[in-house]
Curated annotation (Swiss-Prot):
Locations listed in the record: Nucleus
Function: Functions as a component of the ISW1B complex, which acts in remodeling the chromatin by catalyzing an ATP-dependent alteration in the structure of nucleosomal DNA. The ISW1B complex acts within coding regions to control the amount of RNA polymerase II released into productive elongation and to coordinate elongation with termination and pre-mRNA processing.
Name this protein carries in UniProt: ISWI one complex protein 4
Keyword Transcription: yes
A GO BP annotation: response to heat
Residue numbers bearing the Phosphoserine modification: 2, 65, 73, 242
Residue spans of biased composition, Basic residues class: 259-294
Secretion signal span: none
Length: 475
């Protein structure tokens, strides 16, 4: 709904959660009942953020502005009583020569409204209401949409406009106005009739008793078929009689107090003075203790400390994000599973490197495709290093991988440069160990004599086999 500077006595359409939008009137601060003022919502913000401070400042400003409005209205009333000045129509809504309401200069956080044909008060935010004109009411009543039967009299009353509604009578007696005075007084007198019969004689003068008796005879004689209408004089007589009875009761109480001994008086005074003191002290001596922060076991943030009682959780503020993530059981289980898979994959890469390097030693020419397969496997393994690179330590702690890299770079440097694979292997090495591999100063070469010796060892055995076969044939 629209936000505007609403003024007292404005007719609005207010929306409350769980109910339909209802026509209501904004009640001036001067006419709001005390019990409704006590229910005005004041939100308490415990946080220290800027938005919370701003909200608190807005609430304080609203309270100060309301207090200022009341003081100014009282000052204006005092000035008007003495005849020094008249109310300014720019600052006041002059309802009658006696009744006026101060206008709102700024938008307030809440407004007190009273619903038509419901007579209930509520504090509404400006965003939950909008101005309701007579034309809007006429359109709603003449519309063909389905209507709530309780809303129809409320819209009919709102259609009269704020000038057609007596604000004081609306606040005092409700939507249906002041009740019939004659019926109200007659009921009151009927209720008081048995009380008059039961009243015992008082110490009133003889003239007053004769006067009351003559008046009662006149009232009973004139009301044969229908009860006589109660006038102002009869009501005044009833009030005078009640006042006389109250005065006599007060005299009796004073006489009884005089007859009592002095001790009882002093005791009563002392007791009455000492009673309220401990109550006020008790209220001051009972501050609310701060609520302790307890560990909620159902959160399962750190399942290893379950059963150890309340813990100091302030360490979580400075905890490493990876450690905080692994403190949860499900994340730790997933981490261990990925770690085992990565270790198995590195073991397969090491085996593949050993096979390629050993086969290259026995062969004259290495196969380029084998090294490209190793590069692809290493790249796939590095892709599972984790979002925060937490699995890189598994590569760094694998000594077999480091040894195979050293053999590869020193023994197959010429071939890797020829196939343009040297830089790719160096990039992977730098990604794992944070620096590039520096080959040895002396080039690694295969010992040729080792192959010759192996051939020589095989030849004698072959000749011996031939000789044995020849001897067998000769025999």
């Amino acid at each position: 709904m629209s936000e505007a500077i609403f003024q007292p006595t404005d007719i609005v359409l207010a929306k409350v959660k769980g109910f339909s939008a209802w026509p209501a009137m904004i009640i001036p601060n001067e006419l709001i009942p005390d019990n409704i003022l006590k229910t005005k919502p004041v939100s308490v913000h415990k946080g220290k953020s800027g938005s919370d401070k701003k909200a608190n400042e807005d609430i304080d400003a609203d309270m100060e502005s309301e207090a200022r409005d009341r003081e100014q209205s009282e000052e204006e009333e005092d000035i008007e009583d003495f005849g020094e000045s008249e109310a300014n129509p720019e600052k006041f809504i002059i309802y009658t020569p006696v009744l006026k309401f101060r206008k709102n200069d700024t938008l307030k956080s809440t407004y007190c409204v009273k619903f038509f044909c419901d007579d209930s008060y509520i504090w509404v935010k400006p965003m939950d209401m909008k101005i309701l004109t007579s034309e809007d009411c006429r359109k709603w009543l003449s519309g063909k949409q389905r209507k709530n039967k309780k809303l129809i009299p409320a819209y009919e009353m709102a259609m009269r406009g704020k000038n057609g509604i007596d604000i004081w009578e609306f606040v005092e007696y409700g939507s249906y106005g002041k009740p019939d005075e004659e019926e109200y007084v007659e009921e009151e007198e009927e209720e008081n009739e048995p009380e008059k019969k039961a009243i015992r004689p008082t110490r009133s003068s003889s003239r007053q008793r004769q006067k009351r008796a003559s008046e009662t005879e006149k009232s009973e004689g004139g009301n044969s078929n229908k009860r006589k209408r109660v006038t102002r004089s009869t009501r005044q007589q009833a009030i005078d009689a009640s006042e006389e009875e109250e005065e006599e009761e007060e005299e009796k109480v004073q006489e009884a107090v005089r007859k009592r001994p002095q001790r009882t008086k002093t005791k009563k005074v002392v007791v009455s003075k000492t009673k309220p003191n401990p109550k006020t002290k008790a209220k001051k001596e009972k501050p609310k203790p701060p609520k302790p922060i307890k560990y909620h076991f159902e959160d399962d943030e750190d399942w290893s400390i379950v059963g150890l009682g309340p813990q100091d959780l302030s360490i979580e503020k400075t905890m490493d994000p990876i450690a905080k993530k692994l403190s949860q059981k499900k994340n730790l289980e997933k981490h261990v599973e990925i770690k085992l898979d990565l270790e198995d994959k590195l073991a397969g890469i090491n085996k593949l490197l050993c096979d390629v390097l050993c086969s290259a030693i026995n062969q004259a020419v290495s196969i380029k495709d084998d090294f490209e397969i190793i590069l692809d496997e290493l790249q796939i393994a590095l892709d599972t290093r984790g979002s925060r690179n937490e699995f890189i330590t598994i590569f760094q702690s694998n000594n077999s991988l480091l040894l195979n890299f050293r053999i590869l770079f020193n023994l197959r440097k010429r071939e890797l440069n020829k196939w343009d694979l040297w830089d790719r292997f160096q990039d992977i090495f730098k990604h794992i160990y944070s620096y590039q591999f520096i080959p040895d100063t002396e080039d690694w070469q295969l010992e040729q004599n080792m192959e010759i010796e192996e051939m020589d060892r095989e030849k004698p055995s072959f000749s011996e086999d031939v000789k044995e076969e020849e001897s067998k044939v000769g025999a």
